[in-house]
């Protein structure tokens, strides 16, 4: 079986894991990195890339992100929103999906989604919200990625074709999440792996899985 880890900060040691590693496979400006100067993460760590001039750099990656809005940490929401919208524009320009970090700013994120009308997929990573919040994201076309600490009701309500699984910053086998989610959803682990592989290719614009 092949496990997909849709968002992680650690390179896995397991041979049967395809991991989308933040800063290695994705390019973006996290809201926590906006003070004093925004610095997108790329291969080799943080790079002093000016905002809005990352087209050539970003086009080599699977996705833009993680980026987004955080009402509890980082600079003012005005600054966060301005930089986030630049990355939305970059996502559309280089035809890459968006990986989103959002804390206590869901209503504004949903409003921006409706206003921007993006053609590229957006993923809300590390979702722990309640079913009502899940529905609000699904209604405007989001993919939702679950990690440890998920809301069980939301996990069971999320359509399989819009779901992703991740370890985020936790050092733990992604297989542990798959096993737990399969039990909660009444699926075989193999079936869940197949569904996540399909979602990987859909979200990342038919990017072939590594062999």
Segments from the language model and where they lie:
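Mid-domain alpha/beta scaffold segments of enzyme catalytic cores
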Residues: 1-211
């Amino acid at each position: 079986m092949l496990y997909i880890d849709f968002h992680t900060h650690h390179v896995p040691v397991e041979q049967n894991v395809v991991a989308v590693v933040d800063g290695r496979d994705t390019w973006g400006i996290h809201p926590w990195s906006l003070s004093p100067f925004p610095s997108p993460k790329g291969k080799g760590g943080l790079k002093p890339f000016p905002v809005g001039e990352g087209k050539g750099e970003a086009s080599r990656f699977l996705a833009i992100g993680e980026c987004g809005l955080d009402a509890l940490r980082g600079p003012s929401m005005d600054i966060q929103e301005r930089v986030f919208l630049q990355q939305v524009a970059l996502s559309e320009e280089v035809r890459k999906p968006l990986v989103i970090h959002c804390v206590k700013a869901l209503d504004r994120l949903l409003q921006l989604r409706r206003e921007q009308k993006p053609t590229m997929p957006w993923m809300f990573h590390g979702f722990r919200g309640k079913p009502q919040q899940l529905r609000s994201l699904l209604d405007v076309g989001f993919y939702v990625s679950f990690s440890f600490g998920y809301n069980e009701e939301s996990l069971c309500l999320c359509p399989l074709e819009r779901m992703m699984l991740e370890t985020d910053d936790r050092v733990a086998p992604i297989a542990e999440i798959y096993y737990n989610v399969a039990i909660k959803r009444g699926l075989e682990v193999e079936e869940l792996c197949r569904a996540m592989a399909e979602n990987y290719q859909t979200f990342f614009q038919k990017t072939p899985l590594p062999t």
